[in-house]
Design a protein with these regions (language model features):
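Extracytoplasmic metal-acquisition and chelation regions
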Residues: 1-221
């Protein structure tokens, strides 16, 4: 049983995750969904303030990307001393659906990190921690995921996977509203599936198959 109202907060580091959780929660009042990062803040260069650490210390769930832009998460979880938190990485949720970043000749590399050649296995399960056990991986997930494109939410199929798995994780914390969470998630993923079908229909009917963009990062998915 959660001790106080602050612990009923679900924090998200990206608007996409915030939107998914908000759709799952619907009109239920057990949890409050909030953004950790303020409007206009660039997540690629964001570092949590002492106030942000306090927010993490008092939340019930943290949904973050799990890539090179938020390697600070592991340290923040340790500093927060929140033993009951459920920390969920989006890259872990999509698992093998995550795409490798591709270095193209002539494209400026904005995020440079050294990578080894070992294979990395991503389980399609949330980084859910048992009661009393915080995420103390010391950035292991983030370090392993550095060469994957973080913008997983740009794929509607990924959005469906994330929504369904987040709904399962939230249901684990609040079984009383489980039916409503599942119903809300199904309604939302139905809309995503319809939109994905519309995109596929448009693509199949297209006479031009080449798109010229100015930045590869947002469009890999």
């Amino acid at each position: 049983q959660m001790a106080d109202k602050d612990e009923n907060v679900i924090l998200c580091t990206t608007f996409a995750a915030y939107d998914w959780v908000r759709e799952i929660l619907g009109d239920t009042d057990t949890f409050t969904c909030r953004m950790l990062v303020d409007n206009g803040v660039d997540l690629h260069s964001y570092q949590p303030s002492a106030q942000d650490i306090m927010k993490i210390a008092n939340c019930r769930m943290l949904v973050y990307v799990g890539g090179e832009s938020d390697t600070w998460v592991s340290d923040a979880l340790v500093e927060s001393r929140n033993e009951n938190i459920v920390a969920i990485s989006l890259l872990d949720l999509v698992g093998n659906r995550a795409l490798n970043e591709v270095e193209l000749e002539g494209v400026e590399e904005h995020h440079h990190h050294d990578h080894d050649d070992e294979d990395h296995d991503h389980e399609a399960e949330p980084a859910d921690h048992a009661e009393g056990e915080a995420d103390n991986t010391d950035g292991q997930n983030a370090a392993e995921d550095d060469h994957y494109d973080e913008h997983v939410w740009l794929s509607l199929k990924n959005a469906i996977v994330c929504t369904e798995t987040l709904a399962d994780a939230i249901t684990e914390l609040d079984s009383d509203n489980a039916k409503q969470y599942v119903t809300n998630a199904k309604t939302y993923t139905g809309k995503l599936e319809a939109l994905d079908d519309d995109y596929q229909t448009m693509r199949d009917a297209a006479t031009q198959t080449t798109i010229l963009v100015g930045d590869r990062f947002p469009f890999l998915y």
